[in-house]
């Protein structure tokens, strides 16, 4: 099968990872995969086995299936000659839906169960099951690494996107200092042409907190593996990559429902809290003070991540294409 995928860039974003990982899986299964984006350069942060070409090349090519997930490349995606056009919704409030919904020549897909159901109600037509996404062979526990670090809380540091809830989490953590066992906070983010805001500028950091800027894939994995707790307070997310990566790596996860409903089960493999300081504080306090709870949540995480692997998702999408 000839599969064409469209992205606005290949920077360090969860939506970009989705297309790179799926492309790798489809190539491994013998399919011909081409990624179109404006600059046409290969991603530098994650190996990619498909073909990468400039967006303008799509006009002279054909495919069996074309997949797009953003409004910026939508026009080129629709003009591209393909047997089927699929718009893959990966975030709530996706601006691309303004064009995709009334376009009945486009098949819709979504990356979470909640988003899929919401989109089906709004569109009045079927939505492909594009739910899932994790590389469990990479994101996996390494108990020895965690045992060698002090009590550590890991947080997605992307403050340029308020919906990630980074500052909310930092304020909650600051309020817990001195009221729970001593802990350190580590935040991660990248700063590049696609995410220019330095998250360290004006960050309301609690004591003993630090940023790791631009971690490699291996360094990011090590951060998950060495952290005891991961906190995500997102809103309007499609699929919370970081929460699932933490879960798969054996962290005790505290999260909101946004982007986690498919895999986070309250009191089983995570503590799921309302996105409010009171409820987040209560949940984080529990995992920081109760070592047995931390261990129980951490132990349940890796197995619960397995059904959502990229290989499973790639096969599922191929069956629907």
Region locations from a protein language model:
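Conserved acidic donor-binding segment of nucleotide-sugar-dependent glycosyltransferases
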Residues: 266-278, 286-291
């Amino acid at each position: 099968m000839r599969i064409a995928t469209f992205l606005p860039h290949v920077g360090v974003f969860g939506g970009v990872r989705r297309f790179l990982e799926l492309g790798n899986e489809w190539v491994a299964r013998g399919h011909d995969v081409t990624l179109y984006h404006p600059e046409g350069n290969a991603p530098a942060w994650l190996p990619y086995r498909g073909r990468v070409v400039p967006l303008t090349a799509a006009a002279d090519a054909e495919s069996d299936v074309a997949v797009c997930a953003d409004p910026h490349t939508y026009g080129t995606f629709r003009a591209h000659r393909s047997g089927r056009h699929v718009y893959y919704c990966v975030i709530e409030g996706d601006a691309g839906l303004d064009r995709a919904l009334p376009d009945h020549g486009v098949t819709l897909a979504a990356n979470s169960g909640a988003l899929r159901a919401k989109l089906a109600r709004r569109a009045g037509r079927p939505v492909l099951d594009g739910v899932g996404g994790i590389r469990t062979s990479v994101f996996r526990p390494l108990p020895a690494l965690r045992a060698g670090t002090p009590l550590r809380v890991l947080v997605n540091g992307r403050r340029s996107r308020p919906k990630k809830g980074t500052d909310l989490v930092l304020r909650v953590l600051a309020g817990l200092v001195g009221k729970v066992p001593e802990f350190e906070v580590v935040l991660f983010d990248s700063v590049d042409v696609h995410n220019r805001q330095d998250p360290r500028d004006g960050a309301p950091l609690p004591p003993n907190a630090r940023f790791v800027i631009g971690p490699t894939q291996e360094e990011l994995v090590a951060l998950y593996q060495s952290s005891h707790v991961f906190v995500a307070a997102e809103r309007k997310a499609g699929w919370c990559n970081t929460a699932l990566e933490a879960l798969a790596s054996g962290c005790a996860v505290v999260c909101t429902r946004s982007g986690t409903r498919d895999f986070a089960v309250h009191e089983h493999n995570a503590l799921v809290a309302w996105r409010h300081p009171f409820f987040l504080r209560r949940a984080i306090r529990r995992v920081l003070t109760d070592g047995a709870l931390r261990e129980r949540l951490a132990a349940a995480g890796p197995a619960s991540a397995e059904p959502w692997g990229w290989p499973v998702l790639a096969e599922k999408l191929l069956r629907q294409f």
